[in-house]
C-alpha cells in the first residue's frame, strides 16, 4: 500500500489548506459538504481545501463585521432570516446586545426556528446614547455611533533618568 508523505516544510506553510476545517467557526450550523467528511489526503494527496471555494456557504450564514473607523463605530450583521419585529437591539452597560428570534416556520428544506444573541463592546469614545440602528432591504442590520473627536494635540514627552533600578538589580557602571 502506498502512503503519501508530505515534507514538514510543505505541510507547515499551507497547513490551513491541508488541515481539517474548524467545526466551531462562525458558520457553524450550516450544511456540510461531502468533502468535509474526509481528510484531504483521503481524496487525493494533492487535494487542497481552499477556504475561498466555500464562499457561497459563508455568504448564506449570519456574518458579522465590526468596524472602528476614524469618525464612527459600526456593526454590520446579516439578519436576512428575521423581520424587524423579530429583532431587538439594546444598550446594556458597555455592550450593544442584538437578539433575534423567530418561531418554527417552513423553508425549502423543512421546518426551522432560529434564535441568536450577539454582544459587542462599545468603544470608550462612543456615547451609548448616540447609537442608532437600521435594517437594509437585503437584510443587513447596521448599528453605528459617532466617535468623540479628541482634540488632544501631539506632544513630545521627555524621558527622565532615574537613579534606582526598576527591577531591583543594581545599575551597571
Curated annotation (Swiss-Prot):
This is Alpha-crystallin B chain. The gene is CRYAB. GO terms for cellular component: cytoplasm; nucleus. It comes from Aquarana catesbeiana (American bullfrog). It comes from the Eukaryota. The keyword Acetylation applies. One of its GO terms (biological process) is protein refolding. Heteromer composed of three CRYAA and one CRYAB subunits. Aggregates with homologous proteins, including the small heat shock protein HSPB1, to form large heteromeric complexes. Inter-subunit bridging via zinc ions enhances stability, which is crucial as there is no protein turn over in the lens. GO terms for molecular function: metal ion binding; protein homodimerization activity; structural constituent of eye lens; unfolded protein binding. The keyword Metal-binding applies.
Amino acid at each position: 500500500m502506498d502512503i503519501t508523505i508530505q515534507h514538514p516544510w510543505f505541510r507547515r506553510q499551507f497547513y490551513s489548506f491541508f488541515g481539517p476545517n474548524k467545526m466551531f467557526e462562525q458558520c457553524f450550523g450550516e450544511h456540510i459538504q461531502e468533502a468535509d467528511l474526509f481528510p484531504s489526503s483521503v481524496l487525493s494527496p494533492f487535494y487542497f481545501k481552499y477556504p475561498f471555494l466555500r464562499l457561497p456557504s459563508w455568504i448564506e450564514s449570519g456574518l458579522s463585521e465590526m468596524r472602528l473607523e476614524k469618525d464612527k463605530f459600526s456593526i454590520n450583521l446579516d439578519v436576512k432570516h428575521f423581520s424587524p419585529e423579530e429583532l431587538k437591539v439594546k444598550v446594556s452597560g458597555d455592550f450593544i446586545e442584538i437578539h433575534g428570534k423567530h418561531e418554527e416556520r417552513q423553508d425549502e428544506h423543512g421546518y426551522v426556528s432560529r434564535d441568536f444573541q450577539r454582544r459587542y463592546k462599545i468603544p470608550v469614545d462612543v456615547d451609548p446614547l448616540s447609537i442608532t440602528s437600521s435594517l437594509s432591504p437585503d437584510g443587513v442590520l447596521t448599528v453605528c455611533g459617532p466617535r468623540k473627536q479628541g482634540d488632544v494635540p501631539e506632544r513630545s514627552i521627555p524621558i527622565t533618568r532615574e537613579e534606582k533600578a526598576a527591577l531591583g538589580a543594581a545599575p551597571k557602571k
